[in-house]
Amino acid sequence: MGKVLEKEAFGLAAKDESGILSPFSFSRRATGEKDVRFKVLFCGICHTDLSMAKNEWGLTTYPLVPGHEIVGVVTEVGAKVKKFNAGDKVGVGYMAGSCRSCDSCNDGDENYCPKMILTSGAKNFDDTMTHGGYSDHMVCAEDFIIRIPDNLPLDGAAPLLCAGVTVYSPMKYHGLDKPGMHIGVVGLGGLGHVAVKFAKAMGTKVTVISTSERKRDEAVTRLGADAFLVSRDPKQMKDAMGTMDGIIDTVSATHPLLPLLGLLKNKGKLVMVGAPAEPLELPVFPLIFGRKMVVGSMVGGIKETQEMVDLAGKHNITADIELISADYVNTAMERLAKADVKYRFVIDVANTMKPTP
């Protein structure tokens, strides 16, 4: 595809390991016959964006335009696109491509494809780098575009494309979505608060598990959790032993697993979706004597992401956000590093991100 066919774009990019974002002009590919192009209206800020901007995992190629919680309105579709039209409300999440032929792709688990292409900071099949949603427009293959229900506000829907499917996918896959089940949610941050909302929509009993008593009212009164446990209170934890069918652990800080395993019923599942930087100690005896499982999960496939968003539309589920302007992004990143956000930053891209003269 020649340069003459590419379209100019602008956004915010990190250009070195300081992680500081600054204006950046670049080119996006022309709209291919199976591509969808859309104007970006809002983009959520995920902790992964911060880690990648600072090259904390040693994987970053600069310049990096972050953003994988992207929503907007379709402006152009390719000749062979069948599912979308100009004016549709759409989004793109954590991935923008995969091989589409491996076992994972054939099973609808594109998120586990060995050749999965991340929406931001990854090498595409044509050897160009992908640039994320901190930008004025996106172009993506039709098969990786998500339709956003008309009744959902786009700013609050944006984080669902990462945070939402990250908690929804393991609930569905591990059968923790049955009405009447008892589900624990560890941590009440960007992932945890959305997990509570989806678990309640599925008809389960939800207990939030936190180190902080201060979050009790927020969890129970505002988010609708059925119960709240302070994990540092031995009596509370003891009284709840053996009561939960599954636990979604959203915490990325190092923390003990033994107390959480104690909360599970026999055959219960502890699902890790947070990613602590240091290894966690895993006690084996509770697993052996209760046939309990500790498993991991990462975002979700395209089909289940669409199912998640559709369920959100049915139950009016959105993330609780702080809407920010593009010129506040670096401050937001500093606050995010200190966990100073309730619960997700979202950039008002369309109204505040303008190209430099």
Curated annotation (Swiss-Prot):
Gene Ontology MF terms: cinnamyl-alcohol dehydrogenase activity; zinc ion binding
Cysteines engaged in disulfide bonds, as pairs: none
InterPro entries: ADH-like_C, ADH-like_N, ADH_Zn_CS, CAD-like, GroES-like_sf, NAD(P)-bd_dom_sf, PKS_ER
Residue sites binding Zn(2+) 2 per the record: C99, C102, C105, C113
Pathway the protein contributes to: Aromatic compound metabolism; phenylpropanoid biosynthesis
UniProt keyword S-adenosyl-L-methionine, yes or no: no
Enzymatic reactions: (E)-cinnamyl alcohol + NADP(+) = (E)-cinnamaldehyde + NADPH + H(+)
EC primary class: oxidoreductase
Organs and tissues of expression: Expressed in the differentiation and elongation zones of primary and lateral roots. Expressed in the hypocotyl, cotyledon and leaf veins, hydathodes and trichomes. In stems, expressed in the vascular cambium region. Expressed in the style, anthers, stamen filaments, vascular tissues of sepals and stigmatic regions in flowers, and abscission, style and stigmatic regions of siliques and seed testa.
Binding positions (NADP(+)): 48, 166, 187-192, 210-215, 250, 274, 297-299
EC number: 1.1.1.195
Xref: Gene3D superfamilies: Medium-chain alcohol dehydrogenases, catalytic domain, NAD(P)-binding Rossmann-like Domain
Keywords (A to Z) from UniProt: Lignin biosynthesis, Metal-binding, NADP, Oxidoreductase, Zinc
Residues that bind Zn(2+) 1: C46, H68, E69, C162
Cofactor: Zn(2+)
Cofactor binding description: Binds 2 Zn(2+) ions per subunit.
A Gene Ontology cellular-component term: plasma membrane
GO BP field: green leaf volatile biosynthetic process; lignin biosynthetic process; response to bacterium
Free-text function comment from the UniProt entry: Involved in lignin biosynthesis. Catalyzes the final step specific for the production of lignin monomers. Catalyzes the NADPH-dependent reduction of coniferaldehyde, 5-hydroxyconiferaldehyde, sinapaldehyde, 4-coumaraldehyde and caffeyl aldehyde to their respective alcohols.
Assigned protein family: Belongs to the zinc-containing alcohol dehydrogenase family.
Oligomer status and interactors: Homodimer.
Annotated protein name in UniProt: Cinnamyl alcohol dehydrogenase 7
Species name: Arabidopsis thaliana (Mouse-ear cress)
